[in-house]
């Protein structure tokens, strides 16, 4: 069972809502901007997915071509990109989370303690960006688990520098943990070309971008 080791904290900061002259003209209720988080549970959401080229993983059918193009660009740059995780349905996420809770309780944790600890490793069901079908963990090779200390930093820099060219952003950047609760520099999220360029230029996470339209 593959698991991502995540830095997770209680979110306290509010998204940036200052005004921008170059704000893209988009329908913020569209599928590209769906947020899955503790504040936005998407338990009933089931996207149509297609297989990613060269992988057993799947991705939202409307964005899979963009992901394939990003992966090709990585290969052309000399990397061997590996999809660690892409679409993960609710029931799979629920099983991973409950397995982690049970493991923690066997070690002596109370249910509350076990759930708190489990959330650092596996997002509670309905709160994972992977359920949107628009998020993928991309690394440079297979790892038994993901952490900022083990994944190739040079590849993560390449990913951050190039993903917007294909409509993606880093979903959980290190400088937005106070808003997102996570630090996952390998986790790309499809938001479309215009949003990706804008978010990258202005250093915004998805929560901050969506808040600009509220």
Regions found by a protein language model. Give the residues of each.
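Extracytoplasmic cell-surface/polysaccharide-interacting catalytic and binding patches
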Residues: 6-214
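Short, small-residue-biased leader/transition segments that mark boundaries at the very start
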Residues: 1-5
């Amino acid at each position: 069972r593959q698991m991502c080791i995540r830095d997770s904290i209680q979110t306290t900061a509010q998204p940036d809502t200052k005004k921008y002259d170059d704000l893209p003209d988009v329908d913020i209720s569209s599928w590209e901007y769906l947020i899955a988080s503790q504040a936005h549970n998407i338990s009933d959401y089931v996207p149509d997915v297609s297989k990613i080229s060269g992988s057993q993983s799947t991705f939202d059918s409307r964005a899979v071509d963009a992901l394939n193009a990003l992966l090709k660009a990585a290969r052309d740059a000399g990397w061997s990109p590996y999809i660690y995780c892409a679409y993960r349905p609710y029931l799979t996420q629920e099983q991973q989370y409950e397995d982690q809770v049970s493991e923690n309780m066997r070690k002596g944790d109370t249910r509350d303690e076990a759930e708190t600890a489990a959330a650092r490793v596996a997002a509670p069901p309905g709160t994972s960006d992977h359920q949107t079908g628009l998020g993928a963990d991309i690394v440079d090779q297979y790892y038994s688990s993901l952490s900022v200390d083990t994944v190739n930093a040079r590849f993560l820099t390449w990913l951050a520098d190039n993903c917007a060219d294909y409509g993606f952003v880093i979903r959980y950047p290190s400088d937005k943990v106070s808003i997102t609760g996570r630090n996952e520099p390998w986790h790309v999220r499809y938001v479309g070309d215009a949003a990706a360029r804008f978010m990258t230029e202005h250093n915004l996470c998805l929560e901050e971008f969506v808040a600009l339209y509220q």
